[in-house]
């Protein structure tokens, strides 16, 4: 009698475990990486054009309202308003006429999220290269449009040595 009860119970437990542990496959649409690269490069080009035009509002449109930007040698800027304020300050203080170019190097995408690895080059008005580096931007698609949620950048050029203190 006990064997008759144990067998169905064991079969039931085994069935439950196999069912619970099996992964359900969900169909996801593959991301068209070439189309995505063109879209993100367009955003980078618009960012550079807005910087060159000294339009802080257009530059800040790249970012989500809750974005955080981790720039070199300063505290993170939290929120689009703070990022815009920093951009406006930089634009106001700039008297060089230098401009930057941004290029997509690599993209990783999943669902509504994209991570971009890019390169930047800062040039003088004549087009001579002054500085360069790399950046990483994390985008989320919100209301059908990608917005930068986090970004950070580094310079590839070695830092200039600090001046020696006067003795």
Located regions from the model:
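Bacterial Sec-dependent N-terminal signal peptides
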Residues: 1-31
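Short, low-complexity N-terminal intrinsically disordered segments enriched in polar/charged residues
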Residues: 21-62, 160-167
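A solvent-exposed, acidic/Ser-Thr-rich amphipathic alpha-helical stretch
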Residues: 34-38, 56-112
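Solvent-exposed loop/turn segments at secondary-structure junctions
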Residues: 66, 74-77, 121-123, 154-156
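Short, cysteine-centered beta-strand-loop-beta hairpins and adjacent loop/turn segments enriched
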Residues: 94-96, 122-130
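A short hydrophobic beta-strand element
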Residues: 111-120
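Short beta-strand edge/turn micro-motifs at domain boundaries
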Residues: 132-159
